Amino acid sequence: MRRFSFIFCLLLLLGLSSCEDFLKQTSQNLVTPTTVSEYKDLLQGEGYFQEFSTHARFINFMTDDMEYINYPGSSPSTSSYINMYQNVYCWSQEIENDNFKDEWYGYLYSQVLAGNICLEYLDEVLGSDAEKKVLRGQASFQRAYAYFLLANTYGEPYDATKLGEKCIPLTLTATPVTERYERATLGEIWAQIKSDIAVAVECLRDYSAASNFEINYDAALLLAQRVALYMNDYQLATTYGDMLLERKCDLWNISELGPMLTCSKQSNDGPSVTGQTEGF
């Protein structure tokens, strides 16, 4: 009798464990990256600022490079772009516009996340030291450029005398947290941008990218120069610029270019024009 009871209990335990395994939920399309190559694919798929122009279009309307011309027979109400962006260049504290939603902020933080994921798990993935170095450089560039755009859109301009002023939230991890992100200071944000782009320049120095559509050394030098320029570090900007010109010495004289139009309507005196046409 004891023997039969033991066998019954054993079969019951096996059955319960089998049911537990059967009921476990697994995603049919979930892939966990394990190699440097897979993380590079993740960075290119989730990062690389895809759909950049779509989300950043309204930024142009915040500058004096845009001009609205009311052509005969046209009306602002008939232009989706005017309807959507007409309040962007407005200094009111409270602005209501049901036609426009600022998706630029969230989009840029999704680009930060792509870089953070690669950097956070870099030491755990399979790959050579050389491959990891390239991924570190590309992910650092990704994060630096995203924070550069965020800081310049939603923060005060860089000012060495106001480094304690609040800027934007700063996160360097891909791990979700329940606490609300606090705004970092101007000094903290720009120090991180400068640090990340310096890492990108160093890590990509000896890397020959497979195509121009991959984050490379030239792109890192160009962004590094721009960051130094925005930080009023003209000596460092000159250094990065000279390094880039040694590699890419062909210059384009932009003074020979005519006015650039954002639509097909011709203008004689405006640098950029948007009108009724939908050709943006």
Describe each model-derived feature in a short phrase.
Residues 81-154, 184, 198-206:
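Conserved, well-structured interaction surfaces
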Residues 1-4:
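Positively charged n-region of N-terminal signal peptides that target proteins for export
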